[in-house]
A protein has these predicted regions:
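Flexible, low-hydrophobicity surface segments
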Residues: 145-310, 414
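Phosphate/diphosphate-binding loops
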Residues: 258-259, 264-266, 417-464, 672-691
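Thiamine diphosphate
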Residues: 395-416, 420-422, 626-633
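C-terminal catalytic domains of large/alpha subunits in multi-subunit enzymes
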Residues: 226-227, 381-384, 414-419, 448, ...
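Short beta-strand elements
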Residues: 46, 174, 180, 349-354, ...
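Helix-loop-helix junctions that connect adjacent transmembrane helices in secondary transporters/permeases
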Residues: 295-378, 542-612, 692-717, 721, ...
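Signature of N-terminal electron-transfer/Fe-S-associated modules in redox systems
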Residues: 1-156, 595
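Glycine-rich loop/linker segments at domain edges
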Residues: 90, 165, 171-177, 238, ...
């Protein structure tokens, strides 16, 4: 028992528990986020007697007489200050880490009203952010300090919300102050808690499940097995091969497979009950890697499949082998890239309950409410379900698949109980699909001038325990492996294998991150062989408007690769003159699904009773700022002012399906659908008032038409548009650490330039981790790392100077010229860093994370 103070109010806490649990579960102070419950991420930071502390570490009994402050307890003036500063700096993306950052900001400024950059970085060092790269958070703290010293807090400008303006994001206030709700922030009356009993072995036959002891425990409501599923057991993003619950007699595929679902009155009872469920297994040999999977007598990961090959892709044009044979210079290398964890700050969570219509209402954090609806409807064998997106605490591709949504929906549908299903951080690290590890063999041929003659490659990937998006990732890796260059002869063969490892699927870059590392590293080596600079060899080979890519596509006027090269040239030359090691790499990345697959953007505008225009789209906002983009599109394409427009969060009963938030597609695809709907609304408004239009709907749809892979055309259109980038890395010649990263990105038209910068900075820091030290080790039992703090993510005090250069290049005739930028920001970073280290010590590195650097993590 303890008596202490929370936000100035005395509280009496009879039950000893973690402070985090008391603040969230009993006081419902949901600005205090639960990101890991292990003292690593900092999302739960509060002040205890004025000092920052992670709320998941102290127990309440140890807090006698102490004073606890959360964001809810800030003064009105402080709330206004931090909301403005974080909004003006562009520091808010997914928002999950932000209340913790705000608390650290207050602690610093209370003690030091004029901190320098190093002092700010040090104050934030215990708090992770996976979205922003910290640059704009640091800028927000600087601005908050300045405004606090001056005693004046401006109002955000609402005058110019047109495309091209760096406005404050729509959701800044609710994310800064913690008032916006993520699924874990929901508390439904009489809510139960559900969780899965997971497989004990990566590959085993389930012989029996005995839940009798768990069911006899007071406070346990139900234990559901595969026999309780009313519809289809298997779900999957494209291929239905992921079991919701492994049946008796069924085979486990990895340690994350769910055997049964336990439902209880509270989390403590739930965890105790799970331990009472007895599962009898026949343990079988596991498949650990693609080489084992490919063996002639290898055990099959799936009973239903006659092979462990999950996908094969072959992309060819011209005569690569012949062109290479005729080349003056030829280089071959083997490359390897690792598993990578998304490490979004918000663990997966879903809340389900019966609404007044008797439907299952599912509150989720995922990358497509309509995809969740489709898969859960098949599982339940019923259309009596609705899905509502809440705030999403980061995704990066890792929230495209089912994780908890289907389990929550099943529990409520079968038992009638409202329920929350949330993954622990260890479960999250195990369950959602990761970035594929790749093994790649590349050969490149060039002429005496460094002009690429041909590239030939073979790649192998480990797609883990189920298909997820393994096939499309492999395809994208292959179609982009040629790089953003103008040559004809190209051939690549790719194979993805099932194993009993955790699944691999979508991750920022979608396979291109892996093959770009290979082809760009080869090109840097080729430049040395030819005797020209890495910058010059790229300029000579760069695709230009009207040019033909190796896949045969003729690129449009919006193509801006050369502009990105020219933008980094002054930095490149300055580093060379100063004798600093500098590395360079380019990249391209499609916007939209492409390759002939259906790719629709849809948007509905409704004039509602408040005489405002409400924007509805099924597209999920996962931190990239889509809602702000659509409002800016609407202001640009209608006569309305910002205050006359309302953005509604994605749902499945009003908002039309606009596909997944993936593939850097939503700004362009749904943005164009919104623009078209705006045209219909504007025509209807002519000669009328908003009051006249109440109840009217205006529907916009855009179909991004492309040609399928292997289309019998000389110049197929594989994608509606591509983004282009050049990044360079400058090392400190004395320490060998990264001193500066420069990233120039062609984005078509920047809808919100400051948000574009934030995407670039965040992508660069994420891929610095990929290049230099992030790890996701998997042991001999197919068990991965369990601790968030051991992933090797970069912290605020470790980031270098990052220069984001946003290049507007007109030419695209959709979505006001905007091209998506979310993925490409992470693609060229690793090869640029690898080349810088070659310039530093003469060692060519072809495996990630890079060995023998100051960042290397020793075992």
């Amino acid at each position: 028992m303890a008596v202490f103070f929370v936000n100035g109010t005395e509280v009496n806490v009879p039950k000893n528990q973690k402070l985090l649990r008391y603040l969230r579960d009993e006081l419902h102070l949901t600005s205090v986020k639960d990101g890991c419950s292990e003292g690593a991420c900092g999302a739960c930071t509060v002040l205890i007697d004025g000092e920052p502390c992670r709320a998941c570490t102290p127990s309440t009994d140890a807090l006698e007489g102490r004073h606890i402050l959360t964001v809810e307890g800030l003064t009105d003036e402080e709330k206004k200050l931090y909301t403005y500063a974080y909004g003006e700096a562009g520091a808010v993306q997914c928002g999950f880490c932000i209340p913790g950052m705000v608390i650290c900001t207050k602690a610093l400024l209370d003690q030091n009203p004029d901190p320098n950059e190093n002092e700010i970085k040090n104050a934030l060092r215990n708090n992770y952010c996976r979205c922003t790269g910290y640059v704009k958070i640091i800028a927000a703290v600087k601005l908050a300090a300045k405004l606090k010293r001056e005693g004046v807090i401006p109002e955000p400008s609402e005058n110019d919300w047109k495309v091209g303006s760096s406005v404050h994001r729509l959701d800044v206030e609710e994310k800064v102050l913690g008032t916006g709700k993520y699924p874990d922030d929901w508390y439904v009356p009489n809510m139960a808690y559900g969780s899965a009993v997971r497989a004990k072995y990566a590959r085993a036959r389930v012989k029996a499940i005995d839940a009798s002891k768990a069911l006899a425990m007071p406070g346990v409501y139900a234990v559901l097995t595969a026999e309780d599923i009313p519809g289809e057991n298997k779900v999957g993003h494209i291929k239905h091969d992921q079991y919701t619950l492994i049946p008796v007699g069924g085979l486990t595929h990895y340690l994350g497979d769910a055997i049964c679902l336990v439902v209880a009155q509270d989390p403590e009872t739930l965890e105790k009950a799970k331990k009472l469920v007895k599962v009898d297994y026949e343990v079988l040999p596991a498949v650990h890697n693609p080489w084992e999977a490919a063996e002639e007598n290898a055990p099959h990961v799936f009973d239903e499949e006659g092979t462990n090959v999950q996908a094969v892709r072959h992309v060819a044009r011209g005569d690569a082998a012949g062109a290479i044979a005729r080349s003056k210079y030829v280089i071959s290398q083997h490359f390897e890239t690792p598993w990578t964890e998304h490490a979004f700050l918000e663990p997966e969570c879903a809340v389900a309950y019966r609404d007044l219509d008797g439907d299952v209402m599912l509150l989720t954090t995922d990358q497509s409410a309509h995809t969740t609806l489709h898969e859960c409807s098949l599982l339940l064998g019923s259309k009596k379900i609705k899905v509502q997106n809440q705030l999403v605490g980061g995704g990066f591709g890792g929230k495209e698949d089912m994780s908890v949504q289907h389990h929550a929906a099943l529990i409520t549908y079968v038992t009638g109980l409202p329920v929350k299903v949330k993954l622990s951080r260890a479960e999250s690290l195990l369950i959602h699909p990761k970035r594929h590890p790749f093994w790649m063999d590349f050969t490149m041929g060039c002429d005496e001038n460094g002009i690429i003659q041909g590239v030939k490659a073979k790649v192998v990937s480990d797609t883990g325990a189920f298909a997820s998006l393994g096939g499309p990732v492999l395809e994208r890796a292959c179609t982009h492996a040629a790089g953003p260059y103008a040559y004809e002869n190209f051939e690549i063969e790719g194979t993805a294998y099932y194993t009993n490892n955790p699944p691999a699927g979508a991750f920022r870059g979608f396979g291109v991150t892996q093959t770009c590392f290979a082809v760009e590293t080869l090109l840097n080596e080729m430049a040395d062989k030819v005797g020209i600079t890495p910058w010059e060899i790229r300029l000579r080979n760069a695709i230009r408007p009207g040019g033909v890519l190796p896949n045969g596509q003729i690129v449009g006027a919006e193509t801006g690769l050369v502009e990105t090269l020219e933008a980094v040239k002054p930095y490149y030359d300055a580093a060379v003159r100063a004798g600093k090691p500098v590395g360079l790499a380019c990249a391209m990345k499609n916007a939209g699904v492409g390759v002939g697959l259906p790719d629709y953007g849809r948007c509905k505008l409704i004039v509602e009773a408040d005489e405002k225009l409400h924007i509805y789209s099924g597209a999920s906002c996962i931190g990239q700022g889509l809602g702000t983009v659509l409002v800016q599109m609407t202001v640009t394409n209608t006569p309305l002012r910002r205050e006359q427009i309302v953005y509604e969060r994605s749902n499945t009963w009003i908002a039309p399906d606009s596909g997944d938030t993936s593939g850097s597609r939503q700004t362009m695809i749904t943005g164009e659908a919104c623009r078209r709907a705006c045209g219909l609304f504007t025509a209807a408004l002519e000669g009328h008032t908003m009051h006249d239009l109440i109840g009217q709907e205006f529907y916009g749809e855009y179909y991004a038409k492309t040609d399928p892979l292997g289309a019998d055309k000389p110049n197929p259109v594989s994608h509606v548009a591509y983004g282009y980038a050049t990044q360079l890395c400058v090392l400190n010649p004395k320490t060998g650490r990264v001193e500066t990263m420069v990233a120039a990105h062609d984005v078509g038209k920047a809808v919100n330039p400051k948000s574009c910068e934030g995407q670039i900075e965040g992508g660069v820091v994420m891929s610095m981790g990929y290049a230099l030290r992030e790890q996701y080790p998997i042991d001999e039992n197919c068990k991965p790392i369990e601790k968030y703090g051991r992933l090797g993510l970069f912290r605020a005090h470790e980031i270098p100077d990052i220069r984001a250069i946003v290049i507007d290049k007109p030419g695209l005739d959709v979505a006001c010229g905007a091209i998506g930028i979310g993925e490409i920001t992470s693609i060229p970073t690793a090869p640029a860093i690898a080349d810088a280290y070659f310039r530093y010590d003469g060692e060519r590195r072809t495996k990630l994370p890079l060995a023998d650097t100051p960042y290397e993590r020793k075992a």
